[in-house]
Amino acid sequence: MDNFFLGLSCQEENNFWDLIVADISGDRSVSVPIRSAFRSYMKDTELRMMSPKISSSKVNVKKRMVNLLRKNWEEKKNTVAPEKERSRRHMLKERTRREKQKQSYLALHSLLPFATKNDKNSIVEKAVDEIAKLQRLKKELVRRIKVIEEKSAKDGHDEMSETKVRVNLKEPLSGLDSMLEALHYLKSMGTKLKTVHANFSPQEFSATMTIETQIRGEEVEKRVERRLQETEWKLLFLPEASFYKDY
């Protein structure tokens, strides 16, 4: 809208200067007789020769004055236009910033309790309270987890029981890889290996192991057999993924 009015203003100014120049050029000029009690002595020929020069000189001076005024006016106009454009851009940026800030406050308000007021001060104060409350809860949870882990480690050390685990795998791709993977998995479960008796053949892989563990023997067997099936799948589709080179 500002650009529209600025364009109309420029057009009106140009028309104004054109009218002034047209008046000066003699299209619609009004001559004013010079009244004086004295009259200079000149011949008729000299008067006819000098009158066009005098008239032309007056017109040139007036044109120069008009051009000078127009130049000064355009310079002022050119300095005012960028300032208006800068103010307009600043206003748009400020409006965008306030809109983003409003959306941020609304998003934060949606995460707070239902009874929270929707003014900025209430939102910020309630958010600070909620953050402090969450930090206290976090510290309490960390403390409880630490206590449970310490108790679990102590109870586990006292309740370790010895049991036998038997695993069986039909037509293994690599009995050695299967055995190594079973031992590695038992170690990751926190068990202690006592004895191992294994049988390798192209038709079957079987192993009987005596271990100390907190978990029931049946559960250990299921987990180890499931892990061996995953190992067979890896060896079948990824032949280069042999576990033998990792030990």
From Swiss-Prot:
SMART domains: HLH (SM00353). InterPro entries: bHLH92/bHLH041-like, bHLH95_bHLH, bHLH_dom, HLH_DNA-bd_sf. SUPFAM superfamilies: HLH, helix-loop-helix DNA-binding domain. It is found in: Nucleus. GO terms for molecular function: DNA-binding transcription factor activity; protein dimerization activity; transcription cis-regulatory region binding. Keywords: DNA-binding, Nucleus, Transcription, Transcription regulation. Residues 85-134 form the bHLH domain. One of its GO terms (biological process) is regulation of DNA-templated transcription. It comes from the Eukaryota. Its main location: nucleus. One of its GO terms (cellular component) is nucleus. The keyword DNA-binding applies. Pfam families: HLH. Homodimer. This is Transcription factor bHLH92. The gene is BHLH92.
